[in-house]
Amino acid sequence: MENREFLQARSFGKVAVPTPGTPKPITTDTNLRAAKLRFAVVIGETGRIFLGVAGMNKATGSGVIKEFWPTGAGGGIADELVLESPNGDLLRPADYYVDANVAGEGLIVAYWVWVPHWA
């Protein structure tokens, strides 16, 4: 048997912000590592969403990595950001935070990890 690895997709689902101005971490699991992270707005939501790092401030832009534009009630193409680690599972989802202009809105967050496979 040959030992191989492949990427397996996983998802946090929608990471919603209960209180605008109070960034919410993607996860509190600081041990989790990922090879790839995808952040996308939820179609139909109406407020801007912000992705950043600990201590981010959407009002000043400090710590903000990306500002996502909403699709609105009419739908449309969802704004997204994909981060990839070319050297394996080096991205730590717990390092990323979401903030929103509208309570209850947020981002859909997916991630990929390398898993062993024996063929």
PLM regions and their residue ranges:
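Noncatalytic modules at the cell exterior or secretory-pathway interfaces
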Residues: 35-37, 87-107
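Intrinsic-disorder/low-complexity, polar/charged segments enriched in Ser/Thr/Lys/Arg/Asp/Glu/Gln
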Residues: 12, 23, 34-36, 76-80
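C-terminal interaction-tip segments
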Residues: 1-24, 29, 99-119
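Asparagine-centered strand-capping/turn motif at beta-strand->loop junctions
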Residues: 26, 39-45, 100
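Short proline/glycine-enriched turn/loop motifs at strand-loop junctions of beta-rich domains
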Residues: 32-34, 41-47, 104
